[in-house]
Amino acid sequence: MEIVGSEAKRHFNLKEAEEFREKFFLRKRLFETSDMHFNIYCIAAGQENPLHRHPDSDEILYFVEGTGECVCGDETYDVKTGDLVFVPKDVPHAIRNTHESDNMVCILAQSPLPCVHVAVNRKPIS
């Protein structure tokens, strides 16, 4: 994963960090410290970040742009610009852009580190 910033960089323009791929969502690390990661997810129409969990890390998702669904444990939330979702450690979660043509942008923080990514083998959203 490309790291755009560092501990020294404290100001970002999210529009400049946005980049969309045709086949799979893009994740960029804007910065990291010894205690947390801060990423941007660029999710094109119809794409998703598949169901996974972080055994020892909490995650906060903020939806900057777009509409979609966010699975968090047994709940599925309709999300839109301005929504915030807290994902406690070890809770399976996924994000899906449900719009036919618009992009989705989500920023997120993960802490504490290391943040281990474990795939969960079930379809998150039907």
Q: Which residue stretches match the model-derived regions?
A:
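A short, N-terminal "cap"/entry segment at the start of jelly-roll beta-barrel domains
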Residues: 1-36, 121-126
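A short beta-loop-beta micro-motif enriched in histidine and acidic residues
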Residues: 26, 30-37, 46-60
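Well-ordered beta-strand scaffold positions
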Residues: 34-36, 41, 75-77
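Short, conserved beta-strand element in jelly-roll/cupin
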Residues: 42-44, 53-70, 109
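Structural motif
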Residues: 67-69, 76, 92, 103
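Short acidic-glycine-tyrosine-enriched beta hairpin
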Residues: 74-89
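Ligand-binding loop in jelly-roll beta-barrel domains
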Residues: 89-116
